[in-house]
């Protein structure tokens, strides 16, 4: 689940959480440490319906989810796109991190981690806003104590640049039809609609599911430059297809 922030659409979050609870699924959630992205501020625009589901203390609520087995990733720092770069996984040509100097990226990561630490939330997993990061991001992540990142394409975790990647699905429909491997899907909780909910319910009902904590126990395989080259081209291709569809 993406874009978890204090002002998100709490009604939609509550509805999706209820669906996850029904099927016993404990997901990974990407938490923005210091959200400055107005697009993620949805509580007020949803009025009373949104505020009724909003917890009194956001950070205590997130910490409680972690204690109950939900996996927390740090989703960027402020979720503000200042760079027109796609980095080494160019699904998008905008970024909070890719294109910035190493020292600046490291400072952002350390500030984000400090926010999480101050609320008792520990994680070494990073989720890049817009899926965009570059080699400096990976260096900065290692220096800041992050060893895992939720991105890339594949059917199992892989090792590259001294980081462990937990890939997303290139094309969910095709991934679900495969009889091997594990696929993950990205849920933008602020934009989930009724049709989406029906589709997620169908997926949970028809396919075998596991919690993200179980996925983290999957043995990672090594990936070299050739594998990364294919992944890069797939990301470019998907970006172009999405643009024209």
Residues covered by each model-derived region:
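Hydrophobic faces of well-ordered beta-strands that scaffold small-molecule active sites
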Residues: 27-29, 72-75, 123-126, 148-151, ...
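Catalytic domains of cell-wall/extracellular-matrix polysaccharide-remodeling enzymes
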Residues: 96-171, 193-197
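Short glycine-enriched loops at secondary-structure junctions
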Residues: 33, 76-82
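Alpha-helical scaffolding within the catalytic cores
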Residues: 13-14, 53-62, 154-175
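Generic structural signal for well-ordered alpha-helices
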Residues: 13-17, 59-63, 109-113, 138, ...
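Short, flexible, mixed-charge acidic loops at enzyme active sites
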Residues: 80-92
């Amino acid at each position: 689940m993406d874009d978890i922030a204090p002002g998100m659409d709490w009604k939609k979050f509550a509805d999706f959480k209820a669906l996850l609870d029904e099927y016993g699924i404990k997901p990974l959630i990407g938490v923005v440490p210091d959200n400055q992205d107005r697009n993620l501020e949805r509580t007020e625009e949803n009025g009373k319906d949104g505020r009724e589901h909003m917890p009194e203390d956001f950070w205590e609520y997130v910490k409680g989810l972690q204690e109950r087995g939900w996996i927390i990733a740090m989703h960027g720092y402020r979720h503000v796109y200042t760079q027109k770069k796609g980095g080494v996984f160019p699904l998008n040509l905008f970024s909070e991190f890719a294109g910035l100097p190493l020292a600046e990226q490291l400072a952002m990561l350390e500030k984000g981690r400090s926010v999480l630490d101050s609320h008792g939330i520990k994680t070494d997993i990073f989720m890049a806003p817009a899926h965009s990061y570059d080699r400096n991001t990976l260096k900065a992540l290692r220096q800041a104590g992050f060893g895992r990142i939720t991105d890339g394409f594949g059917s199992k975790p892989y090792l590259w640049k001294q980081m462990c990647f937990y890939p997303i699905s290139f094309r969910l429909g095709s991934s679900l039809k495969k009889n091997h491997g594990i696929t993950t899907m990205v849920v933008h909780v602020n934009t989930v609609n009724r049709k989406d909910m029906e589709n997620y319910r169908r997926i949970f009902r028809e396919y075998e599911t596991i919690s993200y904590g179980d996925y983290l126990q999957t043995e990672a395989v090594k990936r070299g430059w050739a594998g990364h080259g294919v992944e890069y081209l797939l990301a470019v291709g998907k970006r172009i297809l999405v643009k024209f569809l």
